[in-house]
Amino acid sequence: MMHQNHIFKHRPIDPTLYVADIAAIAIPAIHRHGEQEWHYATLACQLHGHVGIYSLLGVKMGLYARKQLNADLASMHVISHAGSTPPMSCFNDGLQVATGSTLGHGLIEVSHDSSPHTEAEFSLQEKHLHLCLKPSYNDIIQSEVAIAQARYGESAEYWHQIRQLAIKYWLEWDRDKIFEQVQ
């Protein structure tokens, strides 16, 4: 079994360690979602190269699945249905960070047998969990991203708006409420 924390002595939660828009949500996000989500979300953003909607959703789903299956880091097998094309595939980065089920450990695979969406299957021994983002949340993302794209095209301001949406969803969306089981 991997150690849970073998780089940091303490999780970096001090808001002064972060850029302004992330520092502004540090305390409320930690209060609302806990240090664990904060830690994995910030790691995922750093790994991913930017603050993105789908990588953060991957973190939230990965942590939710770990809780539901009572799974340690790097103990589950994950099948992602997010595909390999951005922006949806960014979900895979968040899943890997939050679950520890990485490509390097051979514990995650990406299914290409349907259109990409925020859905994943998690297995731990004989336990299995198949989750997706609730359609109402997906509709919010699609609507707000479409508005930003219509207004700004693919300009720098568009990417700024996407970052702001990601930060808003990170802070406001509770991982215990935004997913549902796939039957």
What is each of the regions a protein language model found here?
Residues M2-V51, S55-Q183:
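Non-transmembrane, aqueous-exposed alpha-helical and coiled segments at domain scale
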